[in-house]
Amino acid sequence: DNTLYSYEHSHEYGMRSLASYCNRVFGVSEEETEECYKRANKIMMGRIGSETAAMHNRLMRMQCMLELLEQPLFPHARNMYHAYWDTFIQHIQSNPGILEFMKELKKRKIRIGIGTDMTAYVQYRKLEAIGVTSYIDFIVTSEEAGVEKPHYHFFDICVEKAGVRPEECAFIGDNVKKDIEGAWESGLKGIWYTQEKEPPEHRYFPTIRSFRGIDVDEFLK
């Protein structure tokens, strides 16, 4: 999320679809839907915590929204789940150059893995929509690992699946704490993907500003 594609772009469309459903079925305004969604997220975080993939489960979030709205769970929880995710995925747009970058890596026999905080099913759907599945050799989700990034166990599984030493792995991500610092602390080379932000003060990370036009041979040195 936010490395291969823009999460915010798709999330905006997903929330519009969810708000449309809630307005049509319950007479709830877009603003009320947004506020209820945020309240449900806060409640679920309090119950589940922030270190497990279950925190991302939108079905449970929709369930909590319906409880707050005092509306029936059936059939609305699943309908709201699909209203959000189906629209979200329909509007996924890959970040410029990512497909070409992966293609060039595969030409050079580089194994490509996906390391992501989220439930597996949704991430599989996203990857199919982005169009990168033919380049991917393995996937590690926080649902499989049982912990979220930056926990070392998550990165240990990434290294295990890559089949090489940690120092031979590059982990590209957009989140400094979860992706980059987590990778370096586990012995991998963390590479920060950021289009606008600057690294934290007194910290330096290898940085990718755009996947378009990357010199792959130079990148692999």
What do these predicted regions represent?
Residues 1-96:
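N-terminal helical cap/lid subdomain that shapes the substrate entry/recognition surface
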Residues 9, 24, 28-31, 75, ...:
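Asp-based, Mg2+/Mn2+-dependent phosphohydrolase catalytic module
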Residues 67-70, 108, 203-204:
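Short glycine/proline-enriched coil/turn segments at helix->beta-strand junctions
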